C-alpha cells in the first residue's frame, strides 16, 4: 500500500471533527466519464484524503459514492466512518419543504446513510427545474433565510447530517439566521484566498464559533472561470522561492494559519500530495505582513444569481456590500 499523508482535523461546534484539507469534486466541463472520475477520487483516497466535498449541482455524487464503496470493499479504508463527506443543497431546493427530500436524494446517489456536513449552497432560490446558470426573471424566488435553516436543523435532528452549515453567507445573512436558530451553522464555506482574505467575515465567524472553509484557495487557476490572482502573485512567488515551496503550498498554508480549512481540487496525483505538504513549516511574521498588503478583490460576484427585477439585483445585495 502507498504511504498515506496524515491531515490534521478541526473540531466543529457540533462536536464532530473535520479534516483541515478536503478534496473538492467540482470538475470543469466537459465532465469526464464516470469510471475516469471514480478513479480520480480513488487516487485521492489512496493519497490519504478523507474529507470529500460535493454538491448536488456538481454531478459528481455518483462517482464519489462509487469511489468510497470501492475503497471500503477493497480494504483500502476500513469503514464509512473514516470519511468526512460534505454536500451542498442546490438553489432549486432551497425551500423549507424541499430540503429533506433533496438530502435524501443525495444520500441515495452517494450510497451512504448520512452526511458529515450538509450545507446550503447559496442564499438564493430559483424555481424547481430552472435551467442551471441560465436563469430568467421568472425563475428567481424569494429566499427565506430563517425558514430554510429550520429545515436544515430538521436534517440534523433526524441524524441524516451530523453537522449542518451554509456557503457564501455574509455577516448580515448569518446574523439574521442566528436570530432564530437553535443549532448554529458549523461551517460557512466561502471564497477565501490571499486575494480575498475575508477580513470582515472571518473575525465575525470566529466570534460566533462558525468555522470558515475556503472553496477557492487557489482561485480555480487554470479553468475558464478561474483567475491568476493567487498563482501568479509576485508576493507569493517570492515567498515560495525563498522557502523552497510551491506558490500553491504558500497560498494553502496562509489559509491554514488564519484558522480556516480548505478545499483543493486536482486530478494530478503529485499535486494531491503537494497540496497537503503544508503542516510542518510556517510563514514568518514578515511574510504574513507582505501577504496582508496584497490588494483585495472578491473574485466571484455571482452575477448569474442576479436580475434587475429579481430578489437580488446587484453584487452589493448578494454580498451585503462586502466586495
Curated annotation (Swiss-Prot):
- Site positions (Lowers pKa of active site Tyr) are 88
Is Oxidoreductase one of the keywords? yes
Gene3D superfamilies per the UniProt record, alphabetical: NADP-dependent oxidoreductase domain
Q: What is this protein called?
A: Protein REDOX 2
A Pfam family recorded for this sequence: Aldo_ket_red
- How is the quaternary structure described? Monomer.
Q: Name one GO biological process term.
A: alkaloid metabolic process
**In which pathway does this enzyme or protein participate?**
Alkaloid biosynthesis
Where does the record place the region Disordered? Answer: 302-323
Residues binding substrate are: 121
Biological function: Component of iboga and aspidosperma monoterpenoid indole alkaloids (MIAs, e.g. tabersonine and catharanthine) biosynthesis pathway from 19E-geissoschizine. Catalyzes the second oxidation step of the unstable intermediate product resulting from the reaction triggered by the geissoschizine oxidase (GO) in the stemmadenine biosynthesis process from 19E-geissoschizine.
Deletion phenotype, per the entry, is:
Reduced accumulation of catharanthine and vindoline, but accumulation of 16S- and 16R-deshydroxymethylstemmadenine (16S/16R-DHS) and, to some extent, of akuammicine.
Q: In which tissues is it expressed?
A: Expressed in leaf epidermis.
Lineage: superkingdom: Eukaryota
